[in-house]
């Protein structure tokens, strides 16, 4: 049932892209597609590494990881100012 709903959503989205007069959505999708095609091996490798690294974490380890990510983001923002 979920697969049918996903397929329906994709088909509606494709129809909306086709009917878009401005074509900006089609251009954006094409740009994302080109980026993915060009870097798909790196994207897939990063996805596998991320799933492997995060998949073995307990909830506490994941919370600590997210705190470290947030802290690194804040430090990056402060260094830009």
Swiss-Prot record:
The modification 3,4-dihydroxyarginine is found at residue 26. Its main location: secreted. It is found in: Secreted. The modification 6'-bromotryptophan is found at residue 24. It holds the Pfam family Styelin. GO terms for biological process: defense response to bacterium. The keyword NAD does not apply. It comes from Styela clava (Sea squirt). This is Styelin-E. The modification 4,5-dihydroxylysine is found at residues 27, 30, 34, 38. One of its GO terms (cellular component) is extracellular region. Hemocytes and pharyngeal tissues. Contains L-DOPA (3',4'-dihydroxyphenylalanine). Keywords: Amidation, Antibiotic, Antimicrobial, Bromination, Hydroxylation, Secreted, Signal. The modification 3',4'-dihydroxyphenylalanine is found at residues 36-37, 41-42. Bactericidal against several Gram-positive and Gram-negative bacteria. The modification 5-hydroxylysine is found at residues 40, 44. The modification Leucine amide is found at residue 54. Residues 1-22 form the signal peptide.
